[in-house]
């Protein structure tokens, strides 16, 4: 029986992390943990409750009072906040524009990381985010860092928005993604960084399946 390992997939906004991580988890029958969705869920609740997203203590109190569940379904992972399905609404523009501001707070990240590590206990997980290989799961057996050009990432997010029925402006998305890159890379707590032992893959000109195959080769080497 092959051992069940932890796989960390990091990278900037819209680099293809979630799409690839889901496929890898399906191929291996592993649990997929979308850490970005957890921060989006908190951001959604903060906006819905009128909590100041710049107030770290208020956000921490809200998080401690918030149940965030990631559950598999025939149509993909669903996100529940206090039992309510928020899968689609957390991908909207309001949450997207605010999530990096929520995620930069050290106490919020500390609480989230504790939850994420608990979900990953025992292995058999694929977790994606900004700081999985460097901070959340530093001992993950496989670490991948995905990157792509701002233009390509904006194009992907634009197509994703249109497919979901959201209004979308390609030029505005380019500016927003570049802004999120700066926020994620410059924050003091667990900034976006490639782990020294991570394998970097530039997905700009690769299909999803090509990226998945490259990662599966690495995974199969590790699990024997």
From Swiss-Prot:
Gene Ontology BP annotations: nucleobase-containing small molecule interconversion; pyrimidine nucleotide metabolic process
Translocase in keyword set: no
Molecular functions per Gene Ontology: ATP binding; CMP kinase activity; dCMP kinase activity
Enzyme nomenclature, EC number: 2.7.4.25
Reaction catalysed by this enzyme: CMP + ATP = CDP + ADP; dCMP + ATP = dCDP + ADP
Keywords: ATP-binding, Cytoplasm, Kinase, Nucleotide-binding, Transferase
Binding site for ATP: 11-19
One cellular component (GO) term of this entry: cytosol
InterPro entries on file: Cytidylate_kin, Cytidylate_kinase_dom, P-loop_NTPase
Domain of life according to the entry: Bacteria
Compartments reported by the entry: Cytoplasm
One Pfam family hit: Cytidylate_kin
UniProt keyword annotation of Cytoplasm present: yes
Protein's UniProt name: Cytidylate kinase
Organism: Geobacillus kaustophilus (strain HTA426)
Gene responsible for this protein: cmk
């Amino acid at each position: 029986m092959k051992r069940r390992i932890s796989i960390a997939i990091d990278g900037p906004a819209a680099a293809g992390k979630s799409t690839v991580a889901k496929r890898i988890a399906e191929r291996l029958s592993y649990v997929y943990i979308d850490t970005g969705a957890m921060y989006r869920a908190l951001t959604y609740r903060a906006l819905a409750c009128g909590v100041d997203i710049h107030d770290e203590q208020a956000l921490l109190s809200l998080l401690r009072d918030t149940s965030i569940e990631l559950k598999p379904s025939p149509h993909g992972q669903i996100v529940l906040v206090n039992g309510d399905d928020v899968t689609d609404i957390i991908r909207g523009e309001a949450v997207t524009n605010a999530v990096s501001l929520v995620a930069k707070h050290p106490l919020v990240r500390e609480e989230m990381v504790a939850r994420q590590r608990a979900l990953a206990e025992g292995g058999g997980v694929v977790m994606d985010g900004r700081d999985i290989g460097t901070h959340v799961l530093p001992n993950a057996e496989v670490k991948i860092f995905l990157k792509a050009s701002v233009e390509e990432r904006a194009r992907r997010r634009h197509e994703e928005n249109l497919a979901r029925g959201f209004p979308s402006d390609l030029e505005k998305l380019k500016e927003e993604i570049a802004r999120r890159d700066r926020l994620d890379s410059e924050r003091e707590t667990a900034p976006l960084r490639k782990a020294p032992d991570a394998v970097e893959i530039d997905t700009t000109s690769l299909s999803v399946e090509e990226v998945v195959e490259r990662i599966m080769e690495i995974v199969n080497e590790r699990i024997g």
